[in-house]
Amino acid sequence: MRDWIPKRGLTSWQSLDKLNTKGDSERMIDSTAAALEAVNDAWTRICHECRSVLGSELHYQAMIYHSLRCDGRVPVDQLGMNVKQWIPNVTSDLFKKLDQSKNESFRGGFEPIPDIVIFSPNVGGDWRRRRADHTMKHMLVAIEVKASERANRRLTYSEIAGDIAKLSAHQEEARVRGYNFTPIMLVIDTAPDPKERITQTTSNDLRALCIELGVEWRYLDPCDDEVQRIGSEHRLTSGNEQDK
């Protein structure tokens, strides 16, 4: 039991010794393959629950997190949201460009913030910003979420493509350091008005970009859900396949 779990959060009839922080149904996730299996197991619930309400992008992220905990059975100490990860001395072209675009006094690296991350067990339930390299080492899956939530506007190609490019650059930074993870772009496009959803042409172009950059594409509209795994066989045998 970690000594930083606050006792004040327990009721009078509970004790730290009896508190079960590992649910009985939680699974062992120590590889990229196991993390992707958890995402697949959660996918039906993600589709159902994200179609059941209309809300903000942040709300959909929370629903995806909930689905990964429930049906994906991802342990609580291996599932992070909005994970800040400062990367000094970036090597990818995109992150170099983004670093140089900042005020000179703030240069020296770039900080991607994946919406949802599944980690290997050795992350130890601690993915604070101060542990950036440790956090990167133990990433298995990183998910970026985009949702159609604007009135009289649809998501644009550039908005989603920007996140796809950042996922790819983040993976490149990890690989340079001897790590690896699978990047996933998940688009919740459930707006009831077709004029507020991306066009088929945009969808096709985004899928093509995912193929080019090696990012898994998942798309959900009000009727159909689409999963396109890009180069998954290569990714599943690369880098952080087993927890180290």
Q: What is the role of each PLM region?
A:
Residues 4-71:
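Charged, often low-complexity linker/regulatory segments
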Residues 6, 18-20, 24, 194-244:
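Non-catalytic C-terminal interaction segments of nucleic acid-processing enzymes
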Residues 47-53, 103-105, 147-155:
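Surface-exposed cleft-lining segments at the edges of enzyme active sites
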Residues 77-136:
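Active-site metal-binding core of divalent-cation-utilizing nuclease and nuclease-like domains
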Residues 116-120, 139-149, 167:
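Conserved catalytic cores of phosphodiester-cleaving nucleases, focusing on short active-site segments
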Residues 123-125, 148-153, 191-196:
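Short acidic, S/G/P-rich loop/turn micro-motifs used as interaction or catalytic elements
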Residues 137, 148-171:
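Mg2+/Mn2+-dependent nuclease catalytic core
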Residues 171-201:
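Nucleic-acid nuclease catalytic cores
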